[in-house]
Regions:
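Flexible "stalk/tail and boundary" regions
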Residues: 1-9, 13-14, 22-80, 84, ...
Length: 144
């Protein structure tokens, strides 16, 4: 099954986040949350995180871009276990990085979830919408 869709949520007073049920059913109760690109967070299963980081670290250790990307993704990462209601506590360093104060949005992107502050997501969505056909035409040359 694919992680798809957009779900709005709110941070609780105790800084807990509830993962949407449809996402929990796919990703499970143990996951990794880390810094994402463009000011959001990335939520993935432990297995998916291992696959992503293996793809990055297969390069040469002497390459600064590889080391910096590894620092960015692994240095900010935390393992989380969901409680019986599908919630976990989001550490303050990740809340600060993503600018999440209260309202947030989960966005399913096939193999991972992005977690955005509602304001940042609304702005990003406008930006994408206004350039969607241009972006899609550039992707014609990109291969998996």
């Amino acid at each position: 099954m694919l992680l798809i869709g957009e779900y709005n949520s709110k941070l609780t007073d105790k800084k807990r986040v509830a993962i949407p049920k449809k996402f929990r059913e796919i990703i499970g109760n143990k996951m990794i949350v880390t810094n994402g690109f463009e000011g959001c967070l990335i939520i993935v299963s432990e297995k998916q995180f291992e696959d992503i980081t293996n793809d990055i670290t297969v390069g040469k250790f002497v390459n600064n871009d590889i080391r910096d990307t590894t620092r960015f993704l692994l240095g900010g990462a935390c393992e989380v276990d969901l409680d019986s209601q599908g919630r976990f506590v989001l550490p303050s360093n990740l809340l600060d990085y993503a600018g999440i104060n209260e309202e947030m949005c989960f966005v399913g992107l096939k193999r991972w979830i992005e977690l955005w502050s509602k304001d940042r997501w609304d702005e990003k969505k406008k930006q994408i919408s206004s350039n969607a056909s241009e972006i899609a035409s550039r992707l014609e040359t990109v291969k998996d």
